[in-house]
Amino acid sequence: GLVGSEMCIRDRLMDPATGNVTAKGLCERIGLDGRLTHKVPATGKKVEKDIPMPTHKEAIEAVMAILVDPADGVIKSVDEIDAVGHRVLHGGDKFVESCIIDEACKQAIRDCIPLGPLHNPANLMGIEACEKAMPGKPQVAVFDTAFHMTMPPKAYRYAIPTKYYTEDHLRRYGFHGTSHRFVSKRCIELMGGVENAHRVIVCHLGNGSSLSAVKDGKCQDTSMG
């Protein structure tokens, strides 16, 4: 799985059968001097390297190289990777769930660049670099905004002239959706209930923070714009 932003990429290699993380890493300072950190949880091994990364393309290439490195890698070939998941910041109101990446999906991500100018271009570069490195492998886009697309108009519309919504797509979209989805479902599981019989307030606390109100497993409101 890949999580990309303007100057960094986080990666996880997972065993789909167990959910265990086989390797994880971070490429940072993309566009500057570049630095790669690679960790193998099973052994505690940690590798840090300074690697030129002019763009996200070179960062993806560095990730692939360390994964198959004879000394530091955990797989023999990228052919062992079954699929790639990408966390994509902004899906606008086009996506209500994750989707298999095809040309239409990539164009929709491009169309949302005005809404996510720092992250969406980086997400696209990561997707296209993976397509080149692993042609034919399925790739999935997981949108940060998708979980919040169940909000009613009274929650996502602002008290501003309608033209700003219809022409400029100015509305509440919400973020941290993957976190809010997971936490709300896990909360209901721990309470021993069923998804359609609970109201939950979810707090995402990290480098950015947000709250969401979830009813019957669907987002009703969120604090981010």
Predicted feature residues:
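Short, small-residue-biased leader/transition segments that mark boundaries at the very start
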Residues: L2-C8
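Short glycine-rich, Thr/Ser-proximal phosphate-binding strand/loop in the N-terminal lobe
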Residues: I9-M53
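A structured beta-alpha segment of the ubiquitous adenosine-cofactor-binding alpha/beta core
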Residues: K45-S77
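Conserved active-site and cofactor/substrate-binding residues in soluble primary-metabolism enzymes
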Residues: P54-E58, I100, A104, P121-M125, ...
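Short beta-strand-loop/turn "lid" adjacent to the catalytic site in phosphate-handling enzymes
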Residues: L67, G73-H119, V140, A146-Y156
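General beta-strand structural signal in soluble alpha/beta enzymes
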Residues: H86, P117-N120, P138-F143, I201-C203, ...
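Flexible, glycine/proline-enriched loop segments at strand-loop-helix junctions
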Residues: I109-N120, K137, T166-G177
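Glycine-rich phosphate-binding loop of actin/hexokinase-like ATP-binding domains
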Residues: F147-G225
